[in-house]
From Swiss-Prot:
It comes from Dicentrarchus labrax. Belongs to the somatotropin/prolactin family. Gene3D superfamilies: 1.20.1250.10. This is Prolactin. It is found in: Secreted. Keywords: Disulfide bond, Hormone, Secreted, Signal. The keyword Protease does not apply. GO terms for cellular component: extracellular space. Disulfide bonds join C70-C185, C202-C212. One of its GO terms (molecular function) is hormone activity.
Length: 212
């Protein structure tokens, strides 16, 4: 299964590199493939959050930081589809790329921490986080290439540094709580990434707004 996913990521990148050399494939088709990958990201992050919820200490719910504490919260993004439709395609792609870039380091930390997470489903969680890491990198690299077709605005990336350090804590409750919080933040952002890419796909296909 892992080998198949890795091969899929390599194929996704190979197609985009080919398109960078020759514009043989319509942008709408490339965005369709990107939105399929973002859908996988969001589904996987949702499953991971549910796995963590199944064994989350009551105290953890009390001390979990608010969503506004997520390191990407400072990025101003559309709150719904109607707002997203008002944003230019280049700016929307820039938002997606900024969110993906912001999660490269935190996902590495989550992947490392998952290896020793005090949770009954630790092995499954560790495998899924590694898949998230690979999918996120593949999608980000692909959109980096695709951004060249949308102009300078799409190539701009907002800096959203993660300042949580390289360790999510030592004691059991804090470790589970911090891991859960980071995963919840990623799930929220993966929903934005998926939604924005679907809007971009819709607009590239020149569908009516009500069809998006």
């Amino acid at each position: 299964m892992a080998q198949r996913k890795t091969n899929g990521s390599k194929l996704f990148m190979m197609v985009l590199y080919m398109v960078a050399a020759c514009s043989a494939i319509p942008i709408s088709d490339l965005l369709d493939r990107a939105s399929q990958r973002s859908d996988t990201l969001h589904s996987l992050s949702t499953t991971l959050t549910q796995d963590l919820d199944s064994h989350f200490p009551p105290m953890g719910r009390v001390i979990t930081p608010r969503p506004s504490m997520c390191h990407t919260s400072s990025l101003h993004t559309p709150i719904d589809k109607e707002q997203a439709l008002q944003v230019s395609e280049a700016d929307l792609l820039s938002l997606v790329r900024s969110l993906l870039q912001a999660w490269r380091d935190p996902l590495v930390i989550l992947s490392t921490s998952a290896n020793t997470l005090p949770h009954p489903a630790q092995n499954s969680i560790s495998t899924k986080v590694q898949e998230l890491l690979e999918h996120t990198k593949s999608l980000g690299d692909g959109l980096d290439i695709l951004s060249g077709k949308f102009g300078p605005a799409a190539q701009s990336i907002s800096s959203l540094p993660y300042r949580g350090g390289n360790d999510i804590s030592q004691d059991r409750i804090s470790r589970l709580t911090n891991f859960h919080f980071l995963m919840s933040c990623f799930r929220r952002d993966s929903h934005k990434i998926d939604s924005f890419l679907k809007v971009l796909r819709c607009r590239a296909a020149k569908l009516q707004p009500e069809m998006c």
